[in-house]
Curated annotation (Swiss-Prot):
Record field: compositional bias (Pro residues): 603-613, 633-643, 669-678, 696-705
Protein name: Formin-like protein 18
GO MF terms held by the record: phosphoprotein phosphatase activity
Record field: compositional bias (Polar residues): 491-522, 555-580
Presence of the UniProt keyword Hydrolase in the record: yes
Protein family: Belongs to the formin-like family. Class-II subfamily.
Keyword presence, Hydrolase: yes
Coiled-coil spans in chain: none
This protein's encoding gene: FH18
């Protein structure tokens, strides 16, 4: 039916753009030109007339997106044609979105109209500036009717229908992140039982900003928040209102810098319901000028937990301000149930209560003990200064490491680094060009090109519309680079817009879910791997004895009478020699290379010769060739090889030809040696040049056969081995020999050198006067030791099975890169179940068959796009593929297999991750409550305050109402005049004498030590990973609806998991919000600013204070015990003295 529909498809009338079947858009929506009323009426009337002619029995409905409540021009024109018009708003609080209630009404109305009759046609129109909203609504309709899949791909397809600049002209902020979020709401309509779900009232507690963006030019910003939405206390009023607006002159408005803090928490405590617009605005130094930082639009009914984590690619930002946000920036919006009243943390200041506390008069003697000691100036606090320096250095280092590649500084660093790499590469190439000429491969060049392409802007999704439509776009930009009012979005056409380069587009998070499989760290490729692979494949496969593709190398022949003989057969057969030996046959076994014209001397050396067609019993020594001997005229063609050969008096090994002249050797590179002869059995003899001089002139080689496609026509063909040699010894090797003998031996996987470098031992070995004689190898022993085929005793004794043993081994076809395929097979060797059963277990989410480590390894070896195309294009026998290729084919049978594996990995680790995170959050919560609830610690802090005021009485530091938390550690810095006691020892002494019940206060802080080992930053990352992972699970659950039967069990098991996991994550997010409040309240408890003194610093300082306090108390006890023993000893000594005195 699709083919017939395409064949009979009719073009839409001029002025309409077809989005899908029976859904059209007026092309005036895709331009910024404003038609006059009369021209507009003519334009619409012409389109309506063509529609009536093309669809005579059709009914039409028009969806119009307008601004305001006044009557639109489209409505006034279409009243003459008796058409149904439905008006919708053009935006929602300045955002090119509509509320979920309006979107649902639009989708149901459009679907009902199109299903009512096949003659019904839907027309879409928007007023000037409404194209972003219209594009979002059309994408929603396509996803709702399941005509397209994938939110980003669908929205991108719609935006491509208009010029690329149109979206930026009509929307100062990039609306794609929020639009994609709402499209995901629509795609998830089958996850729950009811869609859209009922709105839930929540309380937006706070917003946490991690890694402060730079909006003031000094590495910081001054953020304030505004919230728009429906009032949850007025259910009858559905209009949006300003629910929260932070006053510009309030104490909560302050400047935050990246060097001071990584996390900023801003309390809001605003009740929300339904569709919510959250705006973050930064104020100028005058607290009047406003600039939009980011905007987030969401719906409370679709929040699956009480935390909404957004990274840099999931917020609406100005088109030219993406680089102001750090790469790892994130905004955490924390919610709580509206009905659950949140108890505010009470802050008890130490100076407010003086019951059971030592007064300042109790430390009257402390001024005498520490009269010459002074406390450090609190303004020059060393501990705080050092900590701030360390924190600033760490933040700066992280900012540099995670900087955006699009920022000018990071771009310059990258360019300089690339230049250094290029210079080093050039230097290495120039040094190694002689020894390793083939250091690059097409695969590496392709990888390099792809890596450079990745630096291009991946965010441009809007392309220019086809010029044949006659659309004219008037691109007018203002010079303003900033938006000073967040409400200016309501009139985007006339708003001042930021300048933006053509390469900047939507944020990078549009493709953030596409992840490639992580590698195993294999970054090195063997040198000359391509040639090595070719050699192995050539030598391992049985070579055909046909000589049609190889020119032959003819041996020197004697002056015997020529005798007609039949042509040599393609398959050599044993021939017995009965003739007597000939004296002239002594030189018949020393072949010379074929003659080549002198003009080839300037060309590069030819490629290495192929391996011999048959396996050799002897190992001939390499001989150098010369191109300078081609000086005589062409001799007569050689005779065909005779059937009968004569015994050779000398060795049958090839003799090296005479060396070329020195002048020629100095100007040309020596070509590779010729291959060994085809059949040779005798041992090598000493090569001599006199035998070559006695031989007749060498006949020219015959014309080579046509080259294959892979050969270069400019490079001369490589000479091949001779067809036969005279001598009786060679005939013994031909007996019982099949196609090839070398295939029965295991290969030696060396890295072959294609040319000998001058001065190396290989070049010296090729000289005739220094040629080394290779030892004789027993081939039968080699076959017995290194045979590639297992030879059993039965097969050796049974001659009938010899042919079966000699059958060549079936070669496996390798399509995947060798090293990756090898590593993949190692990974598969640890999986003890067949591949089909493995994938069935993955789709069933069966954790008993495969563990998380194996799932992660499967993710690493998911086929890439190039590998998938390579496997899909393979048309041969799939049984001949290697195990890695077979594994990849099994993976390709499952749609989005990598995403499903990641979902499986998340499911396996979910419960352990939730348990660990909950344990850490409970530890922090317990530690904060224990510190704030310890009455003994509070009395000790007040005692320290009295001690400090006693010491600083009469000075500027006196009469303090409190002290900084890090001052606790300075109690050990102030020593007495005799340096035998510190303030900490004195404090313990006084408490032991007057308030001994406070000495065991560390027992109240049992969770403090465990809390010092936990960082809120890591807990936040874990919480974000769990929330994001659950979102990916929901997305895959939605996308798997169209997979068919293969994902049936996957969806069923995943739905059960989601029913449990969503409740767990919601509870965990609520605990996370509570713990965050407790951590901030702990800093406030000691009068500190949570933004400057984080929770980690508070608990670390308290733990150090407890440890020093306990140690000082123990030292005091030891000192008291020592003094007591010394007093007893002195008393005994006195008694002894008195006794002696009395005796005298």
């Amino acid at each position: 039916m699709a083919l017939f529909r395409k064949f009979f498809h009719r073009k839409p009338p001029e002025g309409l753009l077809e989005i899908s079947e029976r859904v059209y858009v007026f092309d005036c929506c895709l331009t910024t030109d404003m038609l006059e009323d009369e021209d507009y009426r003519v334009y619409v009337s012409r389109i309506m007339s063509q529609l009536r002619e093309q669809f005579p029995g059709a009914s039409f409905m028009v969806f119009n997106f307008r601004d305001g409540d006044s009557r639109s021009r489209m409505e006034s024109v279409l009243t003459e044609y008796d058409m149904t018009i439905m008006d919708y708003p053009r935006h929602y609080e300045g955002c090119p979105l509509l509320t979920m209630e309006t979107v649902h009404h639009f989708l149901k109305s459009a679907e009902s109209w199109l299903l009512l009759s096949q003659q019904n046609i839907l027309l879409s129109h928007c007023e000037l500036g409404g194209w972003p909203t219209l594009a979002f609504m059309l994408a929603s309709l396509l996803l709702y009717r399941k005509q397209f899949s994938g939110e980003h791909r669908t929205l991108e397809m719609i935006y491509k229908q208009a010029p690329r600049e149109l979206l930026q002209l009509m929307s100062p902020l990039n609306p794609l992140p929020s639009q994609l979020r709402f499209l995901q709401y629509i795609s998830r309509r089958n996850v729950g039982s009811q869609w859209p779900p009922l709105d839930q009232a929540l309380t937006l507690d706070c917003v946490n900003l991690r890694l402060i963006p730079d909006f003031d030019g000094e590495g910081g910003c001054r953020p304030i928040f505004r919230i728009y939405g429906q009032d949850p206390f007025m259910a009858s009023d559905r209009t949006s209102k300003v629910l929260f607006s932070m006053p510009k002159r309030s104490k909560a408005v302050r400047q935050y810098k990246q060097a001071d803090c990584e996390l900023v928490k801003i309390d809001i405590n605003c009740h929300i319901l339904g569709d919510v617009v959250l705006e973050c605005i930064t104020l100028g130094s005058d607290l009047e000028r406003e600039e939009m930082m980011f905007r987030v639009v969401f719906n409370t009914a679709f929040l699956r937990s009480n935390i909404l984590t957004l990274n840099r690619g999931e917020i609406d930002v100005l088109w030219n301000t993406t680089d102001r946000f750090p790469k790892d920036f994130s905004a955490e919006v924390i919610f709580s149930e509206m009905g659950a009243g949140k108890k505010l943390a009470s802050v008890d200041l130490p100076h407010m209560e003086e019951k059971d506390v030592l007064p300042m008069e109790a430390f009257a003697k402390v001024q005498e003990i520490f009269s010459e000691a002074e406390w450090l100036d609190p303004n020059s606090d060393v501990a705080v200064t050092v900590f701030n320096q360390i924190t600033a250095a760490n933040i700066l280092q992280e900012s540099l490491d995670s900087g955006s590649p699009r920022s000018p500084d990071s771009r310059s660093l990258l360019e300089s680094a690339l230049e250094k790499v290029k210079e080093k590469t050039k230097l290495m190439i120039s040094e190694n060009i002689v020894s390793s000429p083939d250091t690059s491969s097409p695969e590496k060049e392709k990888d390099t090109m792809s890596s450079h392409k990745s630096y291009a802007d991946p965010n441009s999704i809007l392309k220019k519309v086809d010029e044949s439509r006659g659309l004219r776009v008037s691109v007018q930009r203002n010079v303003h680079s900033k938006i000073f009012s967040p409400r200016m979005v309501q009139s985007p056409v006339t708003s001042p817009l930021p300048n933006r380069s053509p390469t900047q587009g939507s944020p990078a998070s549009i493709s953030r879910f596409h992840s490639s499989p992580s590698s195993l760290g294999i970054t090195s490729i063997l040198h000359d791997h391509g040639s090595c692979k070719d050699e192995e494949s050539t030598s391992s496969s049985p070579a055909s004895p046909s000589i049609s593709f190889l020119p032959t190398l003819h041996p020197l022949t004697s002056s015997q009478p020529k005798k007609a003989s039949p042509q040599c057969p393609q398959s050599p057969t044993p021939v017995h020699s009965n003739g007597p030996p000939s004296a002239e046959a002594a030189v018949t076994s020393s072949p010379l290379p074929p003659l080549k014209p002198l003009r080839i001397l300037s060309r590069p050396p030819p490629p290495p010769p192929p391996p011999p067609i048959s396996s050799l019993r002897s190992t001939p020594s390499p001989s150098s060739t010369s191109n300078s001997i081609a000086t005589q005229g062409p001799p007569p063609p050689p005779p065909p090889p005779p059937l009968q050969s004569h015994r050779s008096a000398l060795s049958s090994s090839p003799l090296p030809p005479p060396l070329p002249p020195k002048k020629l050797l100095a100007t040309t590179n020596p070509p590779p040696p010729p291959p060994p002869p085809l059949h040779s059995n005798s041992r090598m003899g000493a090569p001599t040049s006199s035998l070559v001089l006695k031989s007749p002139p060498v006949p020219p080689p015959p014309a080579p056969a046509p080259l294959s496609r892979s050969h270069n026509g400019n490079i001369p063909p490589v000479p091949g081995p001779p067809l036969g040699l005279k001598g009786r010894g060679i005939l013994q090797n031909l007996k019982g020999q099949g196609q090839t003998r070398k295939a029965n031996l295991k290969p030696y996987h060396w890295l072959k050198l294609t040319r000998a470098v001058q001065g190396s031992l290989w070049a010296e070995a090729q000289k005739s006067d220094e040629a080394a004689t290779a030892p004789d190898f027993d081939i039968s022993e080699l076959e017995k030791l290194f045979s590639a085929v297992n030879l059993s005793s039965d097969s050796e004794n049974n001659g009938g099975k010899s042919g079966r043993r000699a059958r060549p081994k079936v070669e496996k076809v390798q399509l995947i890169e060798l090293r990756r395929a090898y590593n993949c097979e190692i990974m598969l060797s640890k999986v003890k179940i067949p591949l089909p059963d493995l994938m069935s277990s993955v789709l069933a989410l069966d954790e008993s068959v495969i563990d998380v480590d194996q799932v992660d390894n499967l993710i690493k070896f998911c086929p890439t796009k190039e590998e998938a195309e390579l496997l899909k294009g393979f048309t041969g026998n799939k049984e001949t593929l290697g195990r890695c290729e077979q594994f990849f084919l099994e993976l390709l049978k499952v749609p989005r297999v990598e995403t499903k594996l990641r979902v499986f990995s998340f499911k396996i680790q979910f419960h352990s991750q939730v348990t660990d995170l909950r344990r850490g959050l409970n530890t922090i919560h317990s530690a904060a409550n224990e510190v704030r609830g310890s009455a003994k610690l509070k009395r000790i802090m007040q005692t320290i305050l009295s001690l400090g005021n006693a010491l600083n009485h009469g000075t500027a530091r006196g009469s303090a109402i409190g002290f900084r938390l890090d001052s606790l550690l300075k109690l050990t810095d102030t020593r007495s005049r005799n340096s035998k006691m510190t303030l900490m020892h004195y404090l313990c002494k006084v408490l032991a004498e007057k308030l001994p019940e406070l000495l065991n206060f560390p027992k109240d802080l049992v969770s403090l030590e465990a809390a010092t080992k936990i960082q809120l930053k890591y807990l936040a990352e874990e919480m974000q990973a769990i929330s994001k992972g659950l979102e990916k699970v929901v997305q895959e659950f939605t996308a798997s609806e169209t997979d068919g039967q293969i994902s049936k069990h996957f969806r069923m098991n995943l739905k059960e998991f989601l029913s449990v996991a969503e409740g767990e994550v919601r509870s965990l997010a609520s605990l996370y919000s509570t713990v965050g409040g407790s951590a901030d309240a702990l800093a406030l408890y000691f009068g500190e600013d949570p933004a400057r003194v984080p929770f980690e610093q508070v608990v670390s300082t308290l733990q150090n204070f407890v440890r020093i306090f306990v140690r000082s108390h123990e030292e005091n006890c030891k000192q008291v015990e020592f003094e007591k023993k010394r007093a007893q000893k002195e008393a005994e000594n006195e008694k002894l003295k008195k006794g002696v005195y009395n005796e005298n």
